[in-house]
Amino acid sequence: MIDLIVFLGNYGKKYENTRHNAAWVLCDSIEIGSNAVWQSKFKGQYAKLPSSMTPGRAVHLLKPETYMNLSGESVIAAASFFRLKPENILIVHDELELKPGILSFKWSGGLGGHNGLRSIKSVLNTADFFRLRIGIGRPDFSSQGGDASPDISGYVLSRFAQSELDVLKSQVPQADSFFKELLEADEPQTLIKKWAKVLPSQS
């Protein structure tokens, strides 16, 4: 079962609606996030889902406010307090290797150069946790010329174009369905095939 859902992002006005904050954009739009009662705890914003949504057990939401590179500090604080194992944790994060708006549920795997995932792996001592990846796509640097270094950091820290936000938010109904099924699932692995790659309804 998933007992802790972590939405990765950077804290502060300057990072609102940036690509690296795709998980926060989604969180603020979906049912479980928009209806949550958030409080400052575990070095981030924390909420417990109402018992009506998770009968017989507690499920926790977390938005680390440590900045992306130190996300693990917030995750380990919550995981230790609630005595959770890595396999009970879902990390929701932006993903360069997926086209904008695509949602992809997976178990374990590489870090893809994502500093938030790297920090979490460091504190959990394993990469064996569930992920919901949100596609932000790779930028086209062809206009920079062959000698230019691709500015990936600048890309992920820049704001979504409105068209990209529209595509992401078109996934809210799908994301709501995913989280509903996830909260009801005794074995999250059974959902991987269905939710391995969910295309946006508009692009």
From Swiss-Prot:
It catalyses: an N-acyl-L-alpha-aminoacyl-tRNA + H2O = an N-acyl-L-amino acid + a tRNA + H(+). Keywords: Cytoplasm, Hydrolase, RNA-binding, tRNA-binding. TRNA binds at Y15, Y67, N69, N115. It is found in: Cytoplasm. Gene3D superfamilies: Peptidyl-tRNA hydrolase. InterPro entries: Pept_tRNA_hydro, Pept_tRNA_hydro_CS, Pept_tRNA_hydro_sf. Its main location: cytoplasm. Signal peptide: none annotated. The record marks N10 as: Discriminates between blocked and unblocked aminoacyl-tRNA. The active site is at H20 (proton acceptor). One of its GO terms (cellular component) is cytoplasm. Its EC number is 3.1.1.29. The record marks D94 as: Stabilizes the basic form of H active site to accept a proton. One of its GO terms (molecular function) is tRNA binding. GO terms for biological process: protein quality control for misfolded or incompletely synthesized proteins; rescue of stalled ribosome. Hydrolyzes ribosome-free peptidyl-tRNAs (with 1 or more amino acids incorporated), which drop off the ribosome during protein synthesis, or as a result of ribosome stalling. NCBIfam families: pth. Monomer. HAMAP family: Pept_tRNA_hydro_bact. Belongs to the PTH family. This is Peptidyl-tRNA hydrolase.
